[in-house]
């Protein structure tokens, strides 16, 4: 259990680092839409473009008289007069809402993955049990769950068995009562004819 806890903590730490770096780097890699000094609107784009070098991953912009373009890290720091290492912390503080959104999105993704895993394990219980026992994870809790499952199944069978027999007995008893008056009626209807036949033979 300790190894599983450490593994999950390391996984969450790696996911946090990757999401943070992706959010920080994506801020400088997007050239947002803008209007130049003549009032013409220009669409935004993501760096690097297909025609650019793969190292041009940052968006450079001198002023409104020049177009935005993709540049490398050294040109970006000289043109924009920014230090990426110094401004990463300030950017994280200024855009904490974006980081919160990323964290919420990641949380829901993890919840969906956990629910998907639980659904799959419930649908394929025997297969998961075999793999858990093979990996050494089928400990006391798995045996207890299996024994509880079998006990509930047996109790359900015992509870449904006598109930069905009682229903069948009631059905048969009710069916017998429906057929019994017919025999008595037939006996009653046949008895006058027999009496008349006996009296006619006696005369």
UniProtKB/Swiss-Prot annotation:
Keywords: Glycoprotein, Membrane, Signal, Transmembrane, Transmembrane helix
Transmembrane segments: 98-118
Glycan-linked positions: 53, 63, 72, 83, 95
Membrane topology of the entry: Single-pass type I membrane protein
Keyword hit for Disulfide bond: no
Principal cellular location given in the protein's record: membrane
Annotated compartments: Membrane
Bias type Low complexity, positions: 161-170
Pfam families: Shisa_N (PF13908)
Extracellular-side segments: 26-97
Signal sequence coordinates: 1-25
UniProt topological domain (Cytoplasmic) ranges: 119-203
GO cellular component: a single term: membrane
Biased amino acid composition, Basic residues: 171-184
Region (Disordered): 157-191
InterPro entries in the cross-refs: Shisa, Shisa_N
Family: Belongs to the shisa family.
PANTHER family assigned: PROTEIN SHISA-LIKE-1, SHISA
Protein name, entry field: Protein shisa-like-1a
Species of origin: Danio rerio (Zebrafish)
């Amino acid at each position: 259990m300790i190894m599983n806890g450490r593994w999950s903590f390391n996984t969450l730490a790696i996911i946090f680092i990757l999401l943070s770096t992706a959010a920080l780097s994506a801020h400088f890699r997007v050239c947002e839409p803008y209007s130049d000094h003549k009032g013409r609107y220009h669409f935004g784009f993501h760096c690097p473009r297909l025609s650019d070098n793969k190292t041009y991953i940052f968006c450079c912009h001198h002023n409104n008289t020049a177009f935005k373009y993709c540049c490398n890290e050294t040109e970006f720091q000289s043109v924009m007069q920014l230090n990426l290492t110094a401004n990463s912390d300030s950017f994280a503080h200024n855009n904490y809402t974006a980081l919160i959104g990323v964290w919420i999105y990641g949380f829901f993704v993890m919840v969906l993955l956990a629910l998907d895993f639980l659904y799959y394990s419930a649908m394929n219980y025997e297969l998961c049990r075999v793999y858990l026992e093979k990996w050494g994870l089928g400990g006391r809790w798995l045996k207890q769950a299996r024994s509880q499952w079998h006990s509930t199944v047996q109790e359900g069978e015992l509870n449904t068995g006598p109930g069905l027999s009682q229903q069948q007995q009631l059905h048969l008893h009710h069916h017998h009562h429906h057929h019994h008056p017919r025999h008595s009626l037939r006996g009653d209807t046949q008895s006058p004819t027999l009496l008349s036949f006996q009296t006619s033979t006696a005369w």
